[in-house]
Amino acid sequence: MLKQFFFICIFFALVSHAQVAGTSIFSFLNTSTNARQTALGGKTLNLLDDVDQPTWNPATINSNLNKQISANYSSFLAGISIGSVSYAHNFSGIFKTFHSNITYVNYGEFIQADVDGNETGTFNASDIALALGTSYQIPNSHIYIGTSVKFIYSSIANFSSTGLALDFGAIYYNALKPYTFSLVMRNIGTQLSTFNGESENLPFEVAIGASYLPENLPLRWYLTVDNLQQWDISVPNPSNQTTDLDGNTTEEEISFIDNALRHFIIGAELFPKRAVNVRIGYNFRRGKELQLQNVRTFGGISFGFGLRMNKIKLNYAYSRFHSASNVSTFGLSIDLNKNRTEIAPTKY
């Protein structure tokens, strides 16, 4: 089974070479809106019991998510509001379960001025993405593949841009094993219309993930390695630059190991199957890029909790970006399936 999963990984790697590197538009697509995922470091790919997870890995769409709806909201940095709504529903046929999601970002109101700096009014900016996906089990295997299509709309004042993107995912899941493995390729697509006639790339990303639940320990571990399509993601931190007696400035030198670690996100969930659970995560890249010299800011750390009451789940996450920048994310999930009297075991 794992051999099949390996060949799927090879196929995804070949497809990824067709994507063009460089700056990108619609970067909000790579911002987590889910409170549970945010608490686990900001990016997980292996949550099988969360109706928001298919937004990041469509292979996790499964029949146990039927009639579950979730809403998340966060008052992000600089007064930006970001949120999402997800829903899954079962149908008959080879593609049994479909998943839908709406993600929005409201950047707020800005002062509009002419070339001389004279204020002429105000304008707004916002983003929205609509997604629909499904999954399929490869016959006689424990491998599941999924895909979703996204329509994207972005507006700044009187200018707007639209785009179309695809996500592909694969997951190895065996109910008798304590581990899962995932591979995703996200935001494969193009702009349908541009802001100023110049086409830009979408924020294409390749990532792998894993989870592990020890047999006698109620602590599930999560690991995500992101941005595999681009090895060097290092950005020198201005607070780590040095200046000599002549006033010459030297940027921070980032080592091979330092750059490698910036691809890693780790998380842990205590009592993952209980009514109350606690989560913590660490994003290495965020911690390094927002680090202050000689000051412990705890940037990159996130934590939160989940509370389940019958068919309602409440989630909260606290993300530490900087000593002056922290974000709280709230989530509410409701199981609308009246025939389900208890939480079913995770299965497809």
Regions found by a protein language model. Name each.
Residues Q4-L14:
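Sec-dependent N-terminal signal peptides
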Residues Q19-Y348:
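Subset of outer-membrane beta-barrel
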Residues M1-Q4, N140-S141:
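Positively charged n-region of N-terminal signal peptides that target proteins for export
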